Design a protein with these regions (language model features):
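C-terminal non-catalytic interaction/assembly regions of soluble proteins
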Residues: 1-16, 338-463
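Accessory alpha-helical/coil subdomains and C-terminal extensions
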Residues: 144, 155-156, 193-195, 201-205, ...
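N-terminal phosphate-binding or glycine-rich loops at protein starts, especially the Walker A/P-loop
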Residues: 1-12, 50-104
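Glycine-rich oxoanion-binding loops at beta->alpha junctions
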Residues: 13, 19-55, 101-160, 171-189, ...
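Short glycine/serine/threonine-rich phosphate/pyrophosphate-binding segments
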Residues: 70-80, 103-104, 136-141, 156-164, ...
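Short, ordered loop/turn segments at secondary-structure junctions
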Residues: 66-68, 95-101, 133-134, 158-159, ...
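Gly-rich Lys/Arg/Thr-decorated short loops/hinges at beta-loop-alpha junctions or inter-strand turns
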Residues: 56-64, 99-102, 120-129, 145, ...
Length: 463
């Protein structure tokens, strides 16, 4: 049965979420300063609305997962299916297989999904729908969506309220306006796109092409990345599970290092452009002696360098544990001409293995400066073990809230948005805003200061 006001609390359109809640009161204007463009930005609060605009029995929804694996993918899929089915009575739900290419593939037919089929998916790692990198052919994807868009809207012209980009003196409330007359004459499909920053950029292109063609299709993104590098929202799903699983690798590295003479345990964690997993895993473990992230450059030799620090730590404790994010130190690793140009299927530069490089460099250093002395480096790369696990309890709950927020938004008439928490409150954020934003570790804030306090590592600033 479709959601109704008598069934649950609903959100009013006047309820908004501020993007920024921390202000510099020492400035002349304080919280009312116009110097920061984020100060007056707010987003509509996520949640069910009084009115829905689609006849559930005629509504078709498509769900797709793109990019790399991440804990919680199956939970999001499950909750989208269950939410659409149980909260709104939608009975036509399709799972697009193998990522974006599944929209137009002649060999990977969509799966028909229902609550019984997805009942235990939240206990599984990976994605049952399968995923892939690349395969983004904008026109083939939108052609496929347009061909299958045959849902009828519910409501009359004067019942339907669409939200445009509207700015008052205090808040900017970004959302998306559709053409009412075109909408009432056409069919409607809902597309739920689950993926990371690259996938969100693809979703923006899909949404823009759909708008250009004037076909009314609801497009919503659900941000996914274990790296936690998606901007604006508080965090992406799978991140907390990744931090939890990283503890096992760090603990193993600590045991190996502690059990050897002059032993170093080296752990490489995920994080191409950001070091959030390495940072949080370091703070959670308290076994780490040094944490290296992409946002903080480091150097090996010389005063205040990594080698000097590890040498002193081995003299003091007899062992050390080093955590490095995969994107750290990439500018220090020698590359061939071919490696400089190598890209993966998503168009990203292929990173070299910083862990293997560090292991080699540390062995060279020890052989040079401590010939004949015992030394060992145990290198652990848990990347695929972490990516493949099911979501933990916290991420499972988070995935449920993300999925249900997305459903409520599409059913209320929003399109071209991402659902996610801002300052602890769930909001509807324009896809383009999220696709353009990043979430780097701020090495000048308190979290990085905590890392420096816990590890006593150098700041790697050359004098």
């Amino acid at each position: 049965m479709a959601l109704s006001k008598s069934k649950r609390e609903v959100e009013e359109e006047a309820n908004v979420i501020l993007r920024q809640i921390v202000y510099d009161l020492s400035s002349a204007c304080g919280a009312f300063s116009d110097s920061d463009p984020r100060v007056h930005v707010a987003y509509h609060r996520a949640g069910p609305r009084k009115q829905i605009f689609f006849e559930p029995k005629n509504t078709r929804a498509a769900i797709v997962t793109c990019g790399g694996l991440c804990p919680g993918l199956n939970t999001v899929i499950r909750e989208l299916v269950v939410g659409l089915w149980e909260l709104y009575g939608v009975r036509q739900i399709l799972g697009i297989q193998a990522g974006y290419r599944g929209f137009y593939s002649t060999t990977r037919n969509p799966l028909v999904l229902n609550p019984k089929m997805v009942r235990g998916w939240h206990k599984l790692g990976g994605t049952v729908l399968e995923t892939s990198r690349g395969g983004f052919d904008l026109h083939q994807i939108v052609d496929a969506i347009q061909t299958n868009a045959f849902n009828q809207p519910m409501g009359t012209l004067d019942q339907i309220t669409w939200f445009s980009y509207c700015f008052s003196s205090s808040f900017g409330l970004p959302s998306v306006r559709c053409d009412i007359q075109t909408f009432l004459q056409s069919h409607f499909l809902q597309v739920y796109i689950i993926g990371g920053d690259g996938t969100m950029r693809g979703a923006v292109e899909i949404f823009d092409e759909i708008q250009r063609r004037k076909i009314n299709v609801g497009v919503v993104g659900i941000p996914k990345t274990v790296d936690n590098d998606v901007g604006i929202i508080d965090r992406s799903f799978g991140f907390q599970t990744a931090v939890e699983m990283a503890q096992q690798a760090i603990s193993a590295a600590h045991v190996e290092a502690e059990s050897a003479v002059n032993g170093i345990g080296l752990v490489k964690l995920m994080g191409r452009s950001t070091g959030h997993i390495a940072l949080h895993a370091t703070l959670s473990s308290r076994d780490v002696d040094c944490c290296l992230i992409p946002e903080m450059e480091f150097y090996l030799e010389g005063k205040g360098g990594l080698v000097e620090f590890l040498d002193n730590r081995l003299k003091e404790n007899g062992h050390a544990v080093l955590v490095v994010a995969e994107g750290a130190g990439q500018n220090m690793i020698p590359r061939t001409a071919a490696q400089t140009e190598e890209r993966d299927e998503s168009g990203n530069l292929v990173f070299l293995d910083v862990g293997s490089w560090l292991k080699t460099e540390l062995k060279k250093w020890w052989a040079r400066d401590h010939p004949g002395e015992l030394f060992t480096v145990k290198y652990i790369d848990p990347t695929y073990m972490i990516r493949a696990v099911p979501a933990n309890a916290t991420d499972n709950l988070y995935c449920t809230l993300l999925a249900h927020s997305a459903i409520h938004g599409v059913m209320a008439g929003y399109t071209g948005f991402v659902s996610g928490p801002i300052n602890g409150n769930y909001a509807y954020i324009p896809l383009e805003d999220v696709a353009q934003a990043t979430n780097a570790v701020n090495t000048k804030d308190h979290k990085w200061a905590w890392v420096r306090t816990v590890t006593n590592q150098p700041d790697f600033v050359k004098s």
